[in-house]
Amino acid sequence: NITYIKQDEPRGIAHAIMLCKEFVNNEKFLVFLGDNIIQKSIKNFVENFKNSDYDATVLLCKVDNPSSFGIADIKDGKITKITEKPKEPISNLAVTGIYLLDPVIFEIIDNLKPSWRNELEITDALDNLLRKNNNISYEKITDYWKDTGTPQDILHANGEIISKHPDFVRRHGSNKVIIGKNCK
């Protein structure tokens, strides 16, 4: 069974998570944003979290443009700070939008103030959780990860995947598929 819980207006990822509070029923849970594309399974990350005492595990990935993402600062193997789209990034480790969370996050979200975007930011919730009890771990995605939040990102990801796995593409008809400027 699949259960959909609708967020009627964009009020932030933390707000969307809060809408799921009753559904989660006081169990650890996974948040996987729908615009993520990854190459490998996250099963091991999930199992590690389920068997841990952590309040959260955040999946991170190195990026070339850190000011476009939530960024985690790591010192001595621990997350020390999480910042949403920093103007001056403290690292190049992006928060991927894949979160393993304990229900303690709901108490943190309850006390969040809206950001400058008038949203309840998951990065603020995680940073507050970090300051409260410093019980957040992280895992790094070292293979393929792509945030496809824009149409250009979707096209770019399609091109990358097709070029690496041409055998996955089924061809129908006689025309070639072209991805590029001014295509129709």
What feature does the model see in each segment?
Residues 2-76, 101, 110:
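Conserved beta-loop-beta/alpha segment of the NTase-like Rossmann-fold superfamily
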Residues 75-93:
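A short, charged helix-loop
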Residues 4, 90-93, 139-141:
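Short glycine-enriched loop/turn motifs at secondary-structure junctions
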Residues 7-9, 61, 84-87, 143:
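Residues that form or immediately flank small-molecule/cofactor binding pockets and catalytic motifs
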Residues 3, 78, 135-137:
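Conserved beta-strand segments of alpha/beta enzyme cores
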Residues 103-104, 110-184:
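Left-handed beta-helix
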Residues 52-54, 66-67, 93-94, 172, ...:
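Short gly/pro-enriched beta-turn/loop segments at secondary-structure junctions
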Residues 92-100:
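A conserved mid-domain beta-alpha-beta active-site/ligand-binding segment of alpha/beta enzyme cores
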